[in-house]
């Protein structure tokens, strides 16, 4: 679960059209969210408030062997009007999970020159107690595609009482570049990510003809690398990664595959993540070392639960009521008795109207061939199905999510439940491992955290 400050940072990126998925460090973010999710340790409560559209504060208190706390502040030069509190926020926005990688879109130059957020900035600071540990972050947008990110940590337990990392990031539809410098070991780094294919213009997206778009436009292939060099210890670092993300043209379900290689350490890691339904995701990862021949297989899944267990009978349709349908029922109480909502027509970008092209709008997605064109508009069919699936995921009203991951070689099992309890977001989980001596399971982590934000 994201902290409230992390959530505001993501809203800042969305408000300023900054694509996080186009950064090399996030190339395996989907598999990490399902396999390497953190488990709360002890008891923790977080209370946050957005005083204005430009500023917010957060207070955290935890009890893990001793009482600790922190106080944080955030300021944004861009009004964060698209944020919500823990009572109304969607779980898809509050919890790290499957990321749908969108095809590349190049903004028009005239839009870039007049963009009001081309010089936007974000300031963040946190103070921990007891003790004198501090952390800060500055995000300064230099241009529409370039920003400066500075992270600082001040802690008496660190070498020279702290460290600072500077990122100069350039993010475009075709590629992204990062120049990194850290005061720790005087580390210098370079990250690059290149997207194969030709980016689509934003004007083309708003007025495209689906017959002219091939099916592979739903796929995104990205290849990247990172180079590191510690000037003090004269130690180099090198790694590369490949990501392939696509969506099925028949069901609209997305999947992501990645391959990461570290030639210096001889480590190879491959992942496969697929959204098997609107409310479930499965992920697998295989790690192998060419020097030691050590290998490991990790498996994980996440399963969402709907807030409203009653299904809505859409004549021949059977889906869980999304937030949009719930709003419609509130406006028309006479329909609540039978839980029936009229089927709304889907309007495509070229102003053609399609009346419900999906026969059974459930997690399986059965296609009704009598309602789909069998002529040259096959590209239109695939575009409609993928859009319908994504809209259904975004509009679904979920109340909780259950995450599970295990590793065969490490013999570790992690279980995490995150959901909404009244006005709070709750996260609780456990981490179990097998004792190598007694071969009995033992608890490594066990905790619960509460988050409240206005």
Curated annotation (Swiss-Prot):
Pfam families: MDM10
Location relative to the cell: Mitochondrion outer membrane
Principal location: mitochondrion
Membrane topology field: Multi-pass membrane protein
Transmembrane segments: none
Domain of life: Eukaryota
Function: Component of the ERMES/MDM complex, which serves as a molecular tether to connect the endoplasmic reticulum and mitochondria. Components of this complex are involved in the control of mitochondrial shape and protein biogenesis and may function in phospholipid exchange. MDM10 is involved in the late assembly steps of the general translocase of the mitochondrial outer membrane (TOM complex). Functions in the TOM40-specific route of the assembly of outer membrane beta-barrel proteins, including the association of TOM40 with the receptor TOM22 and small TOM proteins.
Family the entry assigns: Belongs to the MDM10 family.
The record's note on its domains: Lacks alpha-helical transmembrane segments, suggesting that it resides in the membrane via beta-sheet conformations similar to those predicted for other outer membrane proteins and porin.
The protein's name: Mitochondrial distribution and morphology protein 10
Protein species of origin: Candida tropicalis (strain ATCC MYA-3404 / T1) (Yeast)
Upper taxonomic lineage: Eukaryota, Fungi, Dikarya, Ascomycota, Saccharomycotina
Gene: MDM10
């Amino acid at each position: 679960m994201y902290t409230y400050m992390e959530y505001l940072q993501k809203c800042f990126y969305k408000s300023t059209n900054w694509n996080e998925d186009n950064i090399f460090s996030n190339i395996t973010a989907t598999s990490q969210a399902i396999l390497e999710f953190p488990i709360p340790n002890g008891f923790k409560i977080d209370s946050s408030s957005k005083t204005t559209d430009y500023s917010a504060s957060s207070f955290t208190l935890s009890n893990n062997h001793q009482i600790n706390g922190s106080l944080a502040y955030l300021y944004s030069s861009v009004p964060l009007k698209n944020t919500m509190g823990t009572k109304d926020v969607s779980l898809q926005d509050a919890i790290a999970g499957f990321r749908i990688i969108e095809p590349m879109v190049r903004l028009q130059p005239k839009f870039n020159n007049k963009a009001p957020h081309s010089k936007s900035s974000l300031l963040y600071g946190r103070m921990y107690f007891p003790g004198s540990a501090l952390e800060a972050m500055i995000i300064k947008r230099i241009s529409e595609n370039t920003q400066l990110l500075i992270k600082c940590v001040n802690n008496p337990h660190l070498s020279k009482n702290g460290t600072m990392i500077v990122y100069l990031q350039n993010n475009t539809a075709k590629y992204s570049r990062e120049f990194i410098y850290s005061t720790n070991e005087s580390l210098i780094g370079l990250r690059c990510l290149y997207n194969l294919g030709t980016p689509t213009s934003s004007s083309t997206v708003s007025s495209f003809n689906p017959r002219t778009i091939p099916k592979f436009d739903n796929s995104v292939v990205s290849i990247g690398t990172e180079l590191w060099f510690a000037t003090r210890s004269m130690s180099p670092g090198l790694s590369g990664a490949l990501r392939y993300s696509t969506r099925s043209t028949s069901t609209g379900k997305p999947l992501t595959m990645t391959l990461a290689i570290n030639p210096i350490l001889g480590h190879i890691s491959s992942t496969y993540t697929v959204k098997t339904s609107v409310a479930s995701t499965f992920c697998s990862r295989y790690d192998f070392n060419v020097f030691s021949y050590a290998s490991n297989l990790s498996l994980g899944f996440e399963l969402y639960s709907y807030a409203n267990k009653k299904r809505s009978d859409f004549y021949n349709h059977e889906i869980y009521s999304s937030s949009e349908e719930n709003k419609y029922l509130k406006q028309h109480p006479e329909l609540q008795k039978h839980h029936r909502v009229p089927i709304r027509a889907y309007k495509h970008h070229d102003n053609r109207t399609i009346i419900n092209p999906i026969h059974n709008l459930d997690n399986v997605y059965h296609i009704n061939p009598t309602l789909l064109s069998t002529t040259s508009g096959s590209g239109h069919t695939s575009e409609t199905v993928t859009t319908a699936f994504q809209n259904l995921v975004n509009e679904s009203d979920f109340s909780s999510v259950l995450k599970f991951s295990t590793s065969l070689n490490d013999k570790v099992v992690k279980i995490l439940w995150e959901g909404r309890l009244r006005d709070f977001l709750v996260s609780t989980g456990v981490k179990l491992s097998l004792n190598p001596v007694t071969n009995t399971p033992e608890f490594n982590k066990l905790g619960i955290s509460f988050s409240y934000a206005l």
